[in-house]
């Protein structure tokens, strides 16, 4: 961060709402803004684009993430329903909605459409939607005037307890707030400001996987896959690649994503998207099952080719620095092979909502208005340290686990009939990893968050040097 600068004491009386800057107007940033606004916390969202913008690709939310949405504010779940979210599994019971099938081998020459089932697992209440449509509905819940577009962050200043945090933008303007939360994604400028441009964690690394995304009209997809496959989530696995599809937009469109391995370096680390083609995918899947190839032939001729980057090799050492923190992909950008990055971003939002509510209570309880600014600054720092303690382990586990499951999907053994039995043992591991995501103890996280914050506050008041870190053993119900 920039060199120190002294500020005059700013009034932080309980009557004046706490003011938080959220850098980034994607799904995580907007969900966080909705939750904080409902707590009478003034929010300013700074988005570098000219409008809310998301790609039209599909995404899914598990029941755990939807529970977090409800706890933050039920209007978030309502926005998900309004955008045409599709039930991908039974709402009230476990449903083996995740299906893996052999996308490479033909097991019944007399039935060219047959694909051998490999595994089925699932949990209750998954919903799929289009990213852009969900963000459009979420944006309706953000207070008018809370979002400022065309604001590209240049630098941050957080230099003194009794002054504001200052955001400097590339257009020459600046903003002063009580705290900054970076929700600005995998290329996070806030993360770079926290650690420095040359720090390894400031820049994501190429995973040597690329994704080609496309949408297929459901009636065309049914012609190739049949109504059952087209109407349900499937992973087609094979050597060096896998293809995933599931319905979105009220079952009118099939979202298709082909993931290919790429041994070469990515040519431009500043651009994660390049123009690709349907022919690229067909070349990468040469020799695969005819059903998979027929589905690929329904994709548009021109496709976006996305390089998959993550923060696995050089993770952020901390998610907080003073009165600045990072959340979502800015903190723990993951490859998409668990389909859970956004879900854990929603968990982050709940954790931050709980903490900033506690900060408000801390400041409101202070009877000395002259000391409110200092009390607010220290409470925010405590909250952000707590956020790092509570969220770091689980989110970093996801980043690593996502790479692991992709390696299992892409095993060369799928092409060798003598090795199929070995290859199929991977699904026990995939199930265990998936359950850690789906059956997370949200109530345990909320309890740990509150307890950790209070212990840190209490420890600071006692001046005993404790950082108030709870071990996992002290929270037996709180797991990865």
From Swiss-Prot:
Entry keyword annotation includes DNA repair: no
Induction entry: Expression is significantly up-regulated under xenovulene A producing condition.
Alphabetized UniProt keyword annotations: FAD, Flavoprotein, Glycoprotein, Membrane, Monooxygenase, Oxidoreductase, Transmembrane, Transmembrane helix
Subcellular location: Membrane
GO molecular function: FAD binding; monooxygenase activity
Annotated residues for binding of FAD: 47, 60, 131, 329, 342
Biotech / industrial applications: Xenovulene A is a natural product exhibiting little structural resemblance with classical benzodiazepines yet is able to displace high-affinity ligand binding to the benzodiazepine site of the gamma-aminobutyrate A (GABAA) receptor and could be potentially used as an anti-depressant with reduced addictive properties.
Cofactor (UniProt): FAD
Membrane-topology descriptor: Single-pass membrane protein
Protein's pathway: Secondary metabolite biosynthesis; terpenoid biosynthesis
Highest rank taxon of the organism: Eukaryota
EC code(s) of this entry: 1.-.-.-
Transmembrane segments: 17-37
GO BP, sorted A to Z: secondary metabolite biosynthetic process; terpenoid biosynthetic process
Family: Belongs to the paxM FAD-dependent monooxygenase family.
Protein name: Salicylate hydroxylase asL1
Gene it is expressed from: asL1
């Amino acid at each position: 961060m920039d060199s120190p600068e002294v500020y005059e004491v700013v009034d932080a009386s309980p009557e004046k709402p706490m003011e938080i800057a959220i850098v980034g107007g994607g799904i995580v940033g907007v969900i966080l803004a909705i939750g904080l606004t409902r707590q009478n916390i003034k929010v300013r969202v700074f988005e570098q684009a000219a409008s809310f913008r998301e790609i039209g690709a599909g995404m899914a939310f598990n029941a755990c993430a939807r529970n977090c949405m409800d706890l933050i504010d039920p209007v978030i779940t309502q926005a998900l329903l309004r955008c045409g979210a599709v039930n991908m599994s039974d709402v009230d019971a476990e449903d083996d909605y995740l299906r893996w099938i052999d996308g490479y081998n033909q097991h019944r020459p007399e039935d060219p459409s047959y694909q051998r089932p490999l595994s089925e697992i699932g949990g209750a209440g998954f919903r799929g939607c289009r990213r852009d449509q969900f963000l459009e509905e979420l944006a309706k819940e953000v207070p008018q005037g809370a979002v400022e577009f065309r604001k590209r962050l240049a630098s941050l200043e957080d230099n003194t307890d009794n002054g504001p945090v200052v955001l400097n933008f590339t257009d020459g303007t600046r903003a002063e707030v009580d705290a900054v939360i970076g929700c600005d994604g995998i290329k996070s400028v806030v993360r770079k400001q926290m650690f420095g441009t040359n720090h390894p964690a400031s820049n994501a690394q190429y995973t040597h996987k690329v994704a080609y995304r496309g949408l297929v009209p459901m009636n065309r997809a049914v012609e190739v896959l049949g109504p059952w496959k087209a109407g349900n989530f499937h992973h087609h696995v094979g050597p060096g690649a896998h293809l995933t599809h599931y319905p979105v937009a009220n079952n009118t469109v099939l979202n298709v994503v082909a993931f290919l391995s790429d041994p070469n370096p990515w040519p431009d680390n500043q651009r994660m998207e390049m123009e690709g083609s349907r022919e690229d995918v067909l070349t990468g899947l040469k020799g695969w099952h005819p059903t998979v190839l027929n589905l690929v032939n329904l994709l548009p001729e021109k496709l976006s080719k996305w390089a998959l980057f993550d923060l696995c090799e050089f993770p952020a050492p901390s998610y907080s620095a003073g009165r600045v923190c990072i959340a979502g992909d800015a903190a723990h950008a993951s490859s998409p092979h668990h389909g859970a990055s956004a879900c854990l971003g929603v968990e982050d939002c709940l954790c931050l909502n709980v903490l900033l509510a506690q900060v408000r209570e801390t400041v409101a309880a202070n009877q000395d208005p002259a000391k409110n600014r200092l009390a607010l600054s220290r409470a925010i720092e405590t909250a952000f340290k707590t956020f790092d303690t509570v969220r770091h382990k689980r989110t970093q586990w996801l980043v690593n686990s996502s790479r692991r499951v992709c390696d299992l999907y892409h095993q060369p053994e799928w092409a060798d009939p003598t090795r199929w039995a070995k290859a199929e043992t991977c699904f026990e591991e995939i199930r265990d990893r998936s359950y850690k995501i789906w059956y997370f103890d949200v109530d345990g996280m909320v309890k740990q968050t509150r307890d950790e914050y209070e212990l840190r506050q209490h420890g600071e008041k006692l001046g005993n040097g404790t950082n108030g870190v709870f071990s996992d053993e002290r929270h037996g119900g709180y797991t990865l």
